[in-house]
Amino acid sequence: MSSFSQHPDPDHVVVHLSDTHLLAGGHQLYGVIDSDAPLRRLMERLVASGQNIEALVFTGDLADQAEIGAYERLRDLVEPWAAKLDAQVVWVMGNHDEREPFSTVMMREEASQEPQDRVYMAGGLRII
């Protein structure tokens, strides 16, 4: 990456995405907004950029109505692109997200009402 200012080239590249608000079953947000297509286009652009992206950080609201199918949809859309980028995926809940479906689908753990706090390591960078 070339520098266009006084700042040095970055040691780490982290992509932060927020408020995907996906719905289950291919439904559109408010009946008109396709939440998948822009996310898919963004993932394509990230891969095409050639950047060494160490982490994709997704902060809530991941699912608009905390539906299991919405979490599955997001995970299934993002994880193949993350694998192409060799990037760690970091999932963080928002106020629309609920602990049980989040822990089951996004973290691949048993359903839990416990806080979903995590520490991730990505290329020597600790993400809390």
Please annotate each region the language model reported.
Residues 2-6, 68, 72-128:
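Extended active-site neighborhood of metal-dependent phosphoesterases/phosphodiesterases
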Residues 1-72:
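N-terminal active-site segment of His-dependent metallophosphoesterases
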